[in-house]
């Protein structure tokens, strides 16, 4: 029998949890603190792409800007209520831990495209299938209205490139010097 890890239910999801349908909800300006806490728990991402960790004020401005663009969506990825890990904060609206953040824009760069600007999973949850489930869920939700999804990979990030390739995306655009796009046709 497998020993439980610090995340408890993540290692052995509850029978009621559907691992293929992660719970997401739109983020609003009141959620900027949750997004910032996620960033603080995942500093290696910002180190890898060689940018300073955004301040809480910068995160608030970014979330507000996204809410003013009808094509752009920032969603909180919410985990199983039983998940526990250092730095994992809870969403007061749902009483679920914030497992990640998804930022995407519809009809960009072309009509019928969707571009994932950021999929960031909490450091303690990386490598456990959370990101793959989020991507599969987004593909399902956009399948009837989107022909192609592009995923932005910033900096020299071989683990992100490998992640997207594993999800069936292929290298599509070198927007260098620090940006590559991976793409997947999904329909429409």
PLM ranges: what are they?
Residues 132, 155-173:
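Conserved active-site alpha-helix within GNAT-family acetyltransferase domains
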Residues 135, 142-154:
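Conserved GNAT acetyl-CoA-binding A-motif
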Residues 175-185:
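Active-site/acyl-donor-binding loops of N-acyltransferases
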């Amino acid at each position: 029998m497998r020993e439980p890890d610090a995340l408890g239910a993540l290692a052995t999801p509850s029978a009621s949890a559907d691992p293929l349908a992660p719970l997401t909800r739109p983020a609003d300006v009141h959620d900027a603190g949750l997004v910032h806490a996620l960033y603080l728990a995942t500093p290696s991402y910002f180190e890898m792409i060689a940018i300073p960790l955004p301040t809480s004020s910068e995160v608030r401005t970014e979330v507000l800007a996204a809410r003013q663009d009808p094509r752009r969506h920032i969603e909180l990825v919410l985990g199983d209520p039983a998940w526990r890990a250092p730095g994992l904060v809870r969403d007061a609206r749902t009483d679920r831990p914030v497992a990640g953040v998804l930022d995407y824009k519809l009809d960009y760069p072309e009509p019928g495209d969707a571009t994932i600007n950021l999929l960031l999973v909490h450091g303690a949850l990386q490598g456990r299938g959370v990101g793959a489930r989020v991507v599969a869920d987004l593909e399902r939700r956009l399948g009837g209205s989107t022909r192609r999804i592009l995923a932005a990979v910033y900096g020299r990030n071989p683990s992100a490139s490998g992640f997207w390739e594993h999800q069936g995306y292929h290298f599509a655009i070198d927007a260098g010097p620090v940006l590559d796009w991976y793409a997947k046709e999904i329909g429409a």
